[in-house]
Amino acid sequence: MPAEPIPTPAPASRPPGSTASAARMPLAVYILGLSVFALGTSEFMLTGLLPDIADDMNVSIPQAGLLISAFAIGMVVGAPLLAVATLRLPRRTTLIALITVFGLGQIAGALAPNYALLFASRIVSALACAGFWAVGAAVAIAMVPVNARARAMAVMIGGLSIANVLGVPLGALLGDGLGWRSAFWAVGAASAIALVGILTRIPRIPLPAEKPRLGRELRIYRDPQVLLSVAVTALAAGGVFCAFSYLKPLLTDVAHVDAGWVPAVLGLFGVGALIGTTIGGRVADAHLFGVLLSGITASTVFLVALALFASTPAIAITLSFLIGLSAFYTAPALNARMFNVGGAAPTLAGATTTSSFNLGNTAGPWLGGLVISANLGFAATAWAGAAMTVVALALVTVSLRLHKSQSRVVARSADQISADQAHAASPAEVCP
């Protein structure tokens, strides 16, 4: 089946309510979302498989938990490394190679005879996953108008949300019924389906006439707005996952929710994430800073409420849904913001966003672990998470002020150029 042609991007000047903005997403973007579903399921499914893996591999549960940390660290490191390594390679070819390596990593994990090989397979999978996110995001952005970037990213992030709603619980069910290795086989099969979709539906995106230069791409890191975007993304994600990573013991030990209901509550978080991604993706293109400010503020309020009312089951369960909604409501805007300020290096921008999210996903649980080790209780992880999101909110305010200041400078420069051109075009005055 022939690949779809690349849609012609609409002019950036069209308003968000225009026909271009309302146009349907290319099917290729949904194929990327399907691929992210496989990636996300693999990343998060170990939460429900750790006891079985620990028992089968003869290691402790904390040692098995290092498999999760290894994946997150691999994502942080792998995204920029692979973005640089594949900078001059065709995007479609790179996606095919990365999803293939990722799928083989799942098969290797399913067949791993010992903990060391399973650990190695997780690192390989994480590197491929990170590279796919970075390149896939750049491809998705390239196929849509500038004023539809957040919607395109919402489709990709939606794959991650669906992984939380369906993939992770299904992985746990497979693990309970057929053993933990069956979950790895299932993700391998999903990766194969994604590979077919990429082969048949992702267009060949021509390389730029001038080959990308690493030095030029790295210049984006001189921009304070890029650094602010990195910090905001890491802190916003870290604040949520500081509490979410320990939601199960909080529910069972503090709220006294029956352990059998925990998977349903985790699924409720995923439903909130899916709804938040959908809403955020639709409004972020027109109101990017509004989404960031309102979403991170909401996450802060919900985390504080969780810390205060963690012992009340109904409130704790409701807040699990709301935290998922607010966290993923901001995700499309966080992605789009990075592409807006780092547009001169789209692949590195995607890689930087991936690393930023996973830096938060690593730092947040680490901070939560310190809080628990200090005997402050599971509910205190929500206080720590709220502290992180407050800092993120402050940095968004700084970024907004800087953005307004830069916009005024650009507007004044444009007015001056127009005035100079008008003066040059007017007939010279003739003295009587």
Language-model region placement:
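Juxtamembrane intracellular "pre-TM" segments in multi-pass secondary transporters
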Residues: 14-22, 201-230
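Helix-breaking motifs and short loop linkers at transmembrane-helix boundaries and internal kinks
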Residues: 58, 90, 111-117, 128, ...
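Conserved MFS/SLC helix-loop-helix module at the cytosolic interface between two early adjacent transmembrane helices
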Residues: 77-116
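Helix-to-loop junctions at the C-terminal end of transmembrane segments
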Residues: 79-91, 276-288, 372
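Paired small-residue
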Residues: 101, 105-108, 116-125, 314-322
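Helix-loop-helix hairpin linking two adjacent transmembrane segments in secondary transporters
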Residues: 113-117, 132, 145-203, 250
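C-terminal transmembrane helical hairpin of 12-TM major facilitator-type secondary transporters
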Residues: 290-334
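A late C-terminal transmembrane helix in Major Facilitator Superfamily
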Residues: 341-377, 385
